[in-house]
């Protein structure tokens, strides 16, 4: 059991068709901190015969894995543990044999949830860990089933679990382990036929953004980043990766830059399913979700974590954990937002996410000072890029970190990033630096009255002459900042009024 007075631990176990996963988290400061992630390839679905009877060998692989999990569960209160079985355990005709021994090993009941329950829990995990607004389509490709959900906010509007997965498609269409056009075409067509019954409903509902919440999508993102692409998945990138896969004659010879050995076996089958989903639903782009089934189980257990604004919860959690000055962070964020509106808002920083990322960085930019002042920006960058920040993508975390790295003093160009366009990223940095400089007295009542105007990349800051005369340090800092931005090719003029 966890020690009295310590933050409570929670565990979520997913007995999947390809892998068994255990997630252990700690509830702290209004958020969750991951303490352990344990994963074992069990390939349970591969143990189903033509009569859907689970082989003793597959069961034993599962029991061996659960024996490892059981050790960790001893330290967690029983009421803080959820264990669920999914597609293969739903299908197996002899599931009771497996469950009887599994329950004994774990000392906890295992829930075999329906496909609809699985889809609903996946959506909760996505909704509580992924930012953005509007209606979203969620795709989760498992070992023996694929869940597709359309929802808005925390409400799912359509839930579907289809009987196709990366393990079953491997056995059905790549049984000979040949990576040729015939097998890929058959796998893609088979997935398209499986999708047919839901096309009308999902097309009618529509969606604004699409997110993927599975190992297949995780593998794709790892490959794309390793190959120098951005993290957004598109149909053209999927077809490019299919061509790379087909350069290998056999599955055992598959060698794609960024693809790990453990994911290689089911990668072609998962890729085929995803290509079919993109083509049938005419998806433009997909990003990786922050969480899925296991995260959904955790959020079902912790009532305090259920709130509408995921990013606001994340910011508050980080501020509390690192004892940041919340009032000052809000002051900088408001001033940065005001400056953005003065220069034209989305006419100057085109992407709507630009304002969100500007205000987020404003509220968290001082986090590095909790380590050391001298290299505060460097420490801020490291922390913000490596902390778990539900609601923000990997690209957004990288961008926030790079902006925070440069929030004061020496100014250098931003590295390549994929959260915003290069122009918008540069402009967000300029606004943050000005907001930090103008609010350095940490009291909004002492801020100067300023007007910022823009002609393309040329900025002009108008400021009250009497205020500057009364605040010579700020006047000197503004002159230095004007030179720094101008020297790097970002013209900034300071004029008095």
Curated annotation (Swiss-Prot):
<dbReference type="InterPro" id="IPR048950">
    <property type="entry name" value="Ppx_GppA_C"/>
</dbReference>
<dbReference type="InterPro" id="IPR023709">
    <property type="entry name" value="Guo-5TP_3DP_PyrP"/>
</dbReference>
<dbReference type="GO" id="GO:0015970">
    <property type="term" value="P:guanosine tetraphosphate biosynthetic process"/>
</dbReference>
<comment type="pathway">
    <text>Purine metabolism; ppGpp biosynthesis; ppGpp from GTP: step 2/2.</text>
</comment>
<protein>
    <recommendedName>
        <fullName>Guanosine-5'-triphosphate,3'-diphosphate pyrophosphatase</fullName>
        <ecNumber>3.6.1.40</ecNumber>
    </recommendedName>
</protein>
<dbReference type="GO" id="GO:0015974">
    <property type="term" value="P:guanosine pentaphosphate catabolic process"/>
</dbReference>
<dbReference type="InterPro" id="IPR003695">
    <property type="entry name" value="Ppx_GppA_N"/>
</dbReference>
<keyword id="KW-0378">Hydrolase</keyword>
<dbReference type="InterPro" id="IPR043129">
    <property type="entry name" value="ATPase_NBD"/>
</dbReference>
<comment type="similarity">
    <text>Belongs to the GppA/Ppx family. GppA subfamily.</text>
</comment>
<dbReference type="GO" id="GO:0015949">
    <property type="term" value="P:nucleobase-containing small molecule interconversion"/>
</dbReference>
<dbReference type="Pfam" id="PF02541">
    <property type="entry name" value="Ppx-GppA"/>
</dbReference>
<dbReference type="InterPro" id="IPR030673">
    <property type="entry name" value="PyroPPase_GppA_Ppx"/>
</dbReference>
<comment type="function">
    <text>Catalyzes the conversion of pppGpp to ppGpp. Guanosine pentaphosphate (pppGpp) is a cytoplasmic signaling molecule which together with ppGpp controls the 'stringent response', an adaptive process that allows bacteria to respond to amino acid starvation, resulting in the coordinated regulation of numerous cellular activities.</text>
</comment>
<dbReference type="Pfam" id="PF21447">
    <property type="entry name" value="Ppx-GppA_III"/>
</dbReference>
<dbReference type="InterPro" id="IPR050273">
    <property type="entry name" value="GppA/Ppx_hydrolase"/>
</dbReference>
<dbReference type="GO" id="GO:0008894">
    <property type="term" value="F:guanosine-5'-triphosphate,3'-diphosphate diphosphatase activity"/>
</dbReference>
